[in-house]
UniProtKB/Swiss-Prot annotation:
Keyword Nuclease: yes
Record-linked Pfam families: RNase_T
Bias type Basic and acidic residues, positions: 14-23, 54-66
Composition bias type Low complexity, residue spans: 70-87
SUPFAM superfamilies noted in UniProt: Ribonuclease H-like
Compartment(s) of residence: Nucleus, Nucleolus
Function: 3'-> 5'-exoribonuclease involved in ribosome biogenesis in the processing of the 12S pre-rRNA. Displays a strong specificity for a 3'-end containing a free hydroxyl group.
InterPro entries from the UniProt entry: Exonuclease_RNaseT/DNA_pol3, ISG20_DEDDh, REXO1/3/4-like, RNaseH-like_sf, RNaseH_sf
Sorted UniProt keywords: Exonuclease, Hydrolase, Nuclease, Nucleus, Ribosome biogenesis
Encoding gene (name): ISG20L2
Record has Nucleotide-binding as a keyword: no
UniProt main location, coarse: nucleus
UniProt name for this protein: Interferon-stimulated 20 kDa exonuclease-like 2
Amino acid sequence: MSTLLLNLDFGEPPPKKALEGNAKHRKFVKKRRLLERKGFLNKKKQPPSKVPKLHSEPSQKGETPRVDGTWKATPLPKKKTTAASSSGSEQSLDKKAAVPWLTPAPSQKAGSVVAKVDLLGEFQSALPKIKSHPTRPQKKGSQKNPPPKNGPQNSTHTHSENKYSGVSQKIPGKMVAIDCEMVGTGPKGHVSSLARCSIVNYDGDVLYDEYILPPCHIVDYRTRWSGIRKQHMVNATPFKIARNQILKILAGKIVVGHAIHNDFKALQYIHPKSLTRDTSHIPLLNRKADCPENATMSLKSLTKKLLNRDIQAGKSGHSSVEDAQATMELYKLVEVEWEQHLAQNPPKD
């Protein structure tokens, strides 16, 4: 009778490996399972972890090894049910300590699956998108206009200040000075008719200077004051043509003049008051000249006192170019203060 030998190993079992993954990964897996249970995230099929084979015998197709060494036939994988069952088995295995020698070995076909999967991208893509709620429309009258960033906030003349401050900022290209010389027409030459017109820009450069032939017969040339003589009318521009040329220059600009209403009357033209600056009615100039504010000072006297310059001298008469340039220089002396005054007290057209 043969002897039966038993080989028993009473040593300690092999130590268990540490839980797979770090704490951050376990936290992510926990959140992912929670989303899977709530239906926000579809369960993902992953390849089972690798374990050492218990037997050297090759496994046949469709069979998996058991712990006791026997082989068990496994059903063919299905599209959805196997994915759910495999993910369920993975969840149960992950909850327990990972014992590599108890998990089934993967097949060779499963080894071709990519091991690293960007779970974070799938996790974010599966989350429901948050819809932005539209803001409620405010009722009419409830909206408040915000105060301007660069401007006075506590002014009762905001509209007018914006109007005049915008005009004054464009003065170099939008401001001109005009002066006209007249001759006498009509009965006894008592009607003043335009015979010369000069326009200068903000810097005093001449924009227009022409002799103009009145539509009526000239009775008095008024040479002592106007400087106009008969020979000046030989090649003079007809009044209608000259008037159209002048009005094109004045259109949309601030027009400065001394007793400018006489010039507009000779042109048969009315310029907007908001764009008109008359140096004969600016009290600031009189104050600088130490004259009564309500007094009407002549252009000659203001130029002498404030600019220390003599104009309209001699017997040759006035020069409309010289007068227009002097008028512009006088206005520049009080330009800032007078524009602020007009912003607070805008004239009515």
